[in-house]
Amino acid sequence: IRILDTLRRNALGAAGLDSHPNVELVKGDVQDRASVDAAMEGMDYVIHMASIAGVDTVLKNPVPTMEISIEGTMNALRSAREHGKIKRFIDFSTSEVFGTYAFRVREADVTSLGAVGEARWTYAVSKLATEHLAHNYYKQFGLPTCAIRPFNIYGPGQVGEGAIHAFVLRALKNEPIQIHNEGDQIRAWCYIDDIVDAIVAAMTRDEAVGETFNIGNARSSVTIYHLAKLVVQIANSKSTLEFVPWDFADVELRIPDVIKAEKLLGFRAKVDLETGIERTLA
């Protein structure tokens, strides 16, 4: 396994991968074609995840968000095509492509993006563009690609943003937990082990080629308010909940339909929300 990363966040160190004997770490930027080519050498599979993520980070960096996603994906696809031996190229997209209201959405449903000029949607727009790039590299050049749209991943070792990650950190310190507006936004949370199972299936199943898959756990749907209460309860924390105004665009409802992934990948999320939070807290 070879990982190309800028190391701007200590994601690998937090997960213990920086010293794993089966992992080779290459420091580089996906926007630098030479770095991508060096990382691609000798590889059979590509899992392309490089991007800026997290609403707060995207709001502050809308231009780099789009540049890294689009330029980075173009570099990765061109390199993979020229490499000539890639068995599967998996492009990580996002559930954000479904916009502000997404109930039981299927892969073929029309995507819905926000108004031009609203910084939040730069991430979704760029990811939708990378999906089109990946699919058309398959259609036009025969590169065996597929795309995954993950719905709210969480788990141990997570860095950066994400509600469960933020809530867990504060709950363990008995610090107040901030909730945007009334906390009535609904999300479906998918534990990291289930996401990994889906990735492995997408790598190894021929049916995945040329397809896009929603990957998530509709059974773990909950409001942000009740999620915060659940984290506090499981952590046996003394944290209080604070409601803070949020004036930016937000997603009110996001729950996936994963029937396609069940049929073609054999995917079904196994870890329920309570168990996942317990493992994340451990």
Model features per residue range: what roles?
Residues 1-150:
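N-terminal Rossmann-like NAD(P)+-binding domain of SDR-like oxidoreductases, especially those catalyzing
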Residues 35, 75-79, 189, 194-197, ...:
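Conserved mid-core alpha-helix of short-chain dehydrogenase/reductase
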Residues 122, 160, 192, 220, ...:
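Amphipathic alpha-helical segment in the mid-to-C-terminal domain
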Residues 128, 146, 153-166, 175, ...:
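Glycine/proline-rich active-site loop of Rossmann-fold NAD(P)-dependent oxidoreductases
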